From Swiss-Prot:
Known function: Protein covalently bound to the viral DNA that acts as a primer for viral genomic replication by DNA strand displacement. Assembles on the viral origin of replication in an initiation complex with viral polymerase, DBP, host NFIA and host POU2F1/OCT1. The terminal protein stimulates the template activity over 20 fold compared to protein-free templates. Neo-synthesized viral genomes are linked to two preterminal proteins, one for each 5' end.
GO molecular-function terms, A-Z: double-stranded DNA binding; single-stranded DNA binding
Region (Disordered): 374-414, 632-663
Transmembrane segments: none
Gene Ontology cellular component list: host cell nuclear matrix
Family from the record: Belongs to the adenoviridae terminal protein family.
Any single GO BP term: DNA replication
Gene that this polypeptide is encoded by: PTP
Residues carrying O-(5'-phospho-DNA)-serine: S575
Feature type site, description Cleavage: F189, G190, G336, A337
The name this protein goes by in its record: Preterminal protein
Site features described as Priming of strand displacement replication by covalently linking the first nucleotide of the new DNA chain, chain residue numbers: S575
Pfam families, per database record: Adeno_terminal
Species per Swiss-Prot/TrEMBL record: Bovine adenovirus B serotype 3 (BAdV-3)
InterPro entries noted in UniProt: Adeno_preterminal
């Protein structure tokens, strides 16, 4: 007789998944969390815990004075680990874990912030029918300073065309590439303070605490979630890094291709050398990228032929907008670094390029060293049972008063337009190969806003020292903001495990401009609530600062100009002092020496309770002894002090739960 195996218990599967998520978000090993046995809802199980361990007020007291959760949560809290030897853990994990707290600290620590500060942990209790839970929340404030004086020296007002060409190399490089490559060099840089600690102990060696969990790889192996997660991100990032680097090279090559041609209506018989004959074969795109991508030879690309700022800016906007359609039609480009044969195999050159485009694009993508590339396989069409005859189309005569419609033929593309179409197709397909996290382009569209601002200055004839200085400074400020917000969005919103358990409540960016003496000249504040705070902040800041550029050098604004300016920057209530905003618009930016950028965000996450009876029993004894010390006005022991716990006294009977008696 055969016995059928019963299916796995659904609750056990959910429990293991919860323990796995908790391990990733606390930096602990899976073994530690399975020993801890996390529980979110303690409804009808409150009697298993000490009274102080289940209320928001009690956990707040334990967190700040007894267990010191702000720093304890950063340690290796596995059984019999050095941090758990004596007071207050006694060889076991703590009675609570703040799910996601260690992850937030790690994310902030891994970026190039000069200072990191965390507000006091706040606990909120929710008790309703069938639910009793506790949440923790904190506000992180991470900041660093930009040396604006360096940007002043960067500007060459006598040769602004050359300055623009230098800027575009950094713009087209897409800071997201550097962001994904930011793995080791700047980790742990700067200072970290926690408000829950006494002043003399607020400077916390976070990096040392976080690395303690990964010191013995032979012991923890892939269960050291903090370390393994970093390795996993690094490995996944290499593939995205190759794709993003290729996209950058394509955009740079296309921009340099546009610059390589003399401006319209200029007779220039000098030709660049060497010549490149197109379409020499199906793989002309590879030769195109090798010829025009950085590093480039300015002389061979004839940068001196770029006649006007407007032309350079238009080319930058065109390259930045790839793979979207061009904002303005391209004029036919002749000469330059290409020798265009009028016909090949009986077809026009542009027609041949268009016909071969799909094959050429596919070969170019296949040539990239992408690990485990997801190849697209066309699905075969389902076989039809019998061939159906083709329907016969009858030509219907036009109705009375109706004119015959003539077939519209699309106008033939110029050579430059066909080059753009091929480059755009490659970029579009490569973007589809990116992971979701690396596909966040909403943070890097700010460059288009700023180049449109330059276009407006050019049309108004307002290119002067004040507007150019502000444009350059604000451009690089927004570049910093975009890179940082994208980093935070990547880790705090696009991480599935973190987003599933921890909520982003608020995002805020504060910008303070200082003079040479360190005095604040003006400050700006942008706030956005909700889970999409970072992307909404980026959109507002880009629009705001780009709209402020053309107000530079105009002195005091009258009432009508102020109203128009507030409309241009899409001002919202509670987004900074209006007088500060007006002062920023009227300021001479030459007095700005440095700019402080602060990134603040508030998160709320769950408190997990232990279900392990021994951890609950130790916690009762620790709470009892700590309460006695508080009543006797004695200081609390330090972590791992060899304190002998007194025996547990019986607790007073709790009144049974039921309806409250009327007063």
């Amino acid at each position: 007789m055969h016995h059928l195996k019963s299916p796995k218990n659904v609750s056990s599967v959910c429990f293991l998944q919860s323990a796995r998520d908790c391990a990733r978000l606390t930096g602990q090993t899976l073994h530690t969390m399975e020993l801890f046995r996390p529980l979110r809802n303690i409804w009808n199980r409150a009697r298993e815990y000490a009274r102080a361990a289940i209320s928001a007020a009690g956990i707040s007291w334990m967190s700040r004075h007894v267990y010191r959760y702000p720093t304890l949560m950063l340690r290796n809290l596995g059984a019999r680990q050095p941090a758990t030897q004596n007071w207050p853990l006694y060889l076991y994990p703590p009675p609570h874990f703040l799910i996601g707290y260690q992850y937030v600290v790690r994310v902030c620590n891994d970026y190039v912030f000069e200072t990191r500060a965390y507000s006091r942990l706040v606990y909120r209790e929710t008790v309703r029918l069938d639910q009793q839970i506790v949440d923790w929340s904190t506000m992180a404030n991470c900041s660093y300073t930009i040396n604006a004086g360096a940007y002043h020296r960067f500007i060459d007002l006598e040769n602004f065309d050359e300055t623009l060409r230098q800027i575009q190399q950094a713009v087209l490089a897409e800071r997201v590439v550097a962001d994904l490559a930011l793995i080791q060099p700047l980790r742990g840089f700067g200072r970290t303070e926690m408000a829950d600690l006494p002043p003399q102990r607020r400077n916390v060696p976070v990096e040392r605490f976080l690395q303690e969990q990964c010191m013995n790889l032979g012991e923890c192996q892939d269960q050291a979630w903090g370390f393994a997660n970093r390795i996993r991100i690094q490995q996944a990032g290499r593939r995205d890094l190759i794709i993003l680097t290729t996209i950058r090279r394509l955009r740079c090559a296309y921009f340099n291709f546009l610059l390589s041609h003399p401006p319209p209506n200029r007779n220039n018989t000098e030709r660049a050398s060497p010549m490149l004959s197109l379409p020499c074969d199906c793989d002309w795109l590879e030769a195109f990228v090798q010829r025009f991508s950085d590093p480039v030879d300015a002389q061979s690309l004839r940068f001196e032929t770029a006649a006007s700022t407007e032309r350079v800016v238009a080319h930058v906007i065109d390259a930045l907008s790839l793979p979207q359609p061009a904002a303005r039609p391209l004029t036919e480009l002749r000469g330059g670094a290409f020798e265009l044969r009028p016909r090949e195999h009986g077809r026009a050159v542009t027609q041949e390029m268009r016909i071969r485009r799909g094959e050429m694009v596919q070969r170019f993508i296949e040539s990239l060293p992408l690990p485990t590339r997801r190849r697209r396989v066309a699905r075969p069409a389902p076989p039809s049972p019998s061939p159906s005859p083709e329907p016969v189309e009858l030509e219907m005569p036009p109705l009375e008063g109706e004119e015959e419609e003539e077939e519209e033929e699309l106008p033939p593309r110029s050579f430059a337009e066909e080059v753009r179409a091929a480059v755009a197709e490659v970029i579009r397909l490569l973007q589809e190969e990116l992971t979701v996290s690396a596909r966040n382009e909403q943070f890097f569209n700010f460059a288009v806003d700023f180049y449109e601002a330059i276009n407006m200055l050019e049309r108004e004839g307002n290119i002067n020292e004040s507007t150019i200085r502000r444009w350059v400074i604000y451009f690089f400020i927004v570049e910093h903001i975009a890179t940082t917000l994208n980093y935070l969005h990547h880790h705090l919103r696009l991480s599935p495990v973190f987003a599933r358990h921890v909520e982003l409540n608020l995002g805020q960016v504060v910008m303070r401009a200082r003079d040479e003496d360190g005095a604040v000249i003006y400050s700006r504040v942008w706030n956005e609530p909700g889970t999409n705070a970072f992307s909404q902040l980026m959109r507002r800041i880009s629009t705001d600062l780009a709209a402020t550029v053309h107000r530079a050098g105009r002195g005091e604004l009258d009432e009508e100009e102020i109203e128009r300016f507030m409309t241009d920057i899409a001002y919202r209530d509670h987004s900074g002092d209006v007088e500060e905003i007006i002062r920023q618009a009227e300021l001479n930016d030459a007095s700005i020496n440095s700019v402080d950028l602060s990134f603040r965000f508030k998160v709320t996450g769950p408190v997990a309770f232990t279900q392990h009876p021994e951890i609950q029993r130790i916690n009762r004894r620790v709470v009892q002894h700590a309460s006695d010390l508080r009543q006797q006005l004695q200081p609390m022991p330090e972590l791992n002090d060899p304190v002998q716990l007194p025996p547990l006294r019986p607790e007073r009977q709790r009144p049974p739960l039921g309806p409250r008696r009327p007063l």
